[in-house]
């Protein structure tokens, strides 16, 4: 009787496995039903498009219109694998100045980089410089100009994770605005299509990095530390370096 019961259980498992193997997964439906949907401006509700090497994080407008509002939550940013920056090493710090002997079981002479919270001062500053450098560079902020959070209503935003497109619809001063944001799959390019009867302008800002450990990596008061040049300016395009 026991052998018969065991045979029935094994047979049932085999039939279940066979049935599952014959049932194809609708991958698109699986992904699409988990698309994030945003209906209000919230500093924790930013969404990102990218290609694995380049990423553009947007707010409820589909662009980076309110970076200050989102800075304490999921901050808005544009980052890449290749965009890095280092502050000048004016004091000529050496990596050896950050090392300290920390014996551990099995490793009596373990040498590790530490922060030196109690000094010496030069070692602490060396450790801080190497902690902060190099760091990823925020490549630029792209957003609508002169919009206030209070002017944005009836937000309906969805990230299509299957296509990699961010679809945003909202009212600005009761005028409808539709924005589609996407990133090129092969090149580090972000694009946005804006449809509206409202007279909207788009601005581009380039921040200087901060080097801090936990902020939105943007300093807007260091204009003397970097510059931006307009190489080409035409009615429908511009080349900025």
Segments the model singles out, each with a brief description of its role:
Residues 23-241:
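Beta-sandwich/jelly-roll carbohydrate-recognition scaffolds of carbohydrate-active enzymes
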Residues 6-12:
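Sec-dependent N-terminal signal peptides
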Residues 3-4, 16-26:
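Bacterial Sec-dependent signal peptides at the C-terminal "C-region" and cleavage site
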């Amino acid at each position: 009787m026991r052998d018969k019961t065991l045979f029935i259980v094994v047979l049932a498992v085999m039939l279940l496995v066979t049935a599952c193997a014959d049932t194809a997964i609708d991958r698109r439906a699986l992904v699409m039903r988990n698309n994030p949907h945003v209906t209000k401006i919230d500093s924790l509700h930013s969404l990102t498009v990218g290609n694995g090497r380049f990423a553009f994080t947007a707010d409820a407008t589909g662009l980076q219109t309110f970076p200050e509002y989102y800075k304490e939550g999921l901050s808005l940013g544009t980052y890449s694998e290749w965009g890095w920056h280092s502050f000048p090493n004016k004091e000529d710090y050496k990596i050896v100045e950050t090392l300290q002997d920390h014996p551990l079981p099995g490793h009596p002479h373990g040498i590790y980089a530490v922060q030196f919270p109690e000094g010496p001062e030069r070692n602490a500053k060396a450790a801080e410089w190497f902690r902060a450098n190099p760091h990823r560079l925020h490549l630029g902020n792209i957003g609508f100009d002169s919009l206030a959070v209070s002017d944005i209503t009836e937000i309906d935003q969805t990230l299509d994770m299957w296509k990699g497109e961010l679809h945003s619809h909202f009212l600005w001063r009761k005028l409808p605005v539709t924005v589609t944001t996407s990133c090129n799959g092969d090149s580090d390019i972000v694009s946005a299509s804006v449809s509206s009867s409202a007279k909207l302008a788009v601005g581009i800002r380039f921040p200087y990095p901060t080097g801090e450990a936990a902020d939105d990596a943007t300093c807007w008061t260091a204009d003397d530390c970097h510059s931006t040049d307009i190489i080409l300016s035409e009615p429908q395009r511009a080349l900025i370096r």
